[in-house]
Amino acid sequence: IMDIVITYVDGNDPVWKKDYEKYTNVPVMQKRFRDWGTLKYLLRGIEKRMPFIRNVYLVVSHPSQVPSWADREYLKIVLHKDIIPEEFLPTFNCNPIEMNLHRIPGLDEEYLYFNDDMFPVGDCSPTDFFRDGKAVIGYYRHLFASNMYKKICRNSDRLAREALGLKPSVFFTRPQHICSPMLKSVCDEVYEKVNAQIREASA
């Protein structure tokens, strides 16, 4: 039994668009924030292929972001203000959002983090994601940080290693575009030990 956390943005939502343009002073880029309707298929896949899931949390910025067709009894809605410190809101950057997902009240120790464009297309079992209390992860190994995203990954890898007392490495890991198994207790520990850096990155 484990939980699922999904982050979601509907770039067509007038409330969200108004806030985005007000705080960023740039127009919404449709190619970046367009809703392709994939969330519905992700939820169908979870229901059909992952019967061991306890709760499904949908993390959004505002209630207007929740699709009208969503089953409110099935989906547990989490607003950014429920998990992200007020001084960092509103945010339109995925990094502060992802760094605070483990703070969802009632979240299980073992949880899976999904984007809305990731789908379970075959039958899954709990051991696909966690074994003996450890996460089964799919990561790429890199030596060079050739773009901004990889630089963020490299820095995150370094901070996590320091926080958890792991040896430094010339290599760093980058997650594949698949769901990420997460342990809440580990996230709590890293969050506490590198809180200053997290707050700086959230500002």
Regions of interest found by a model, annotated:
Residues 12-16, 64-69, 119-123, 128-131, ...:
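Short catalytic/ligand-binding loop motif for oxyanion handling, primarily in non-cytosolic enzymes
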Residues 11-34, 139:
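A solvent-exposed, charged loop/short amphipathic helix patch at secondary-structure junctions
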Residues 45-53:
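Short, acidic, metal-binding catalytic loop of nucleotide-sugar glycosyltransferases
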Residues 30, 34, 64-108:
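Active-site-proximal specificity loops/subdomain of glycosyltransferases
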Residues 2-11:
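Short, hydrophobic/glycine-enriched beta-strand segments
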Residues 53-63:
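Short beta-strand/loop segment that forms part of the nucleotide-sugar
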Residues 136-203:
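Long, charge-rich alpha-helical interaction segments
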Residues 64-65, 100-143:
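GT-A fold catalytic core of metal-dependent nucleotide-sugar glycosyltransferases
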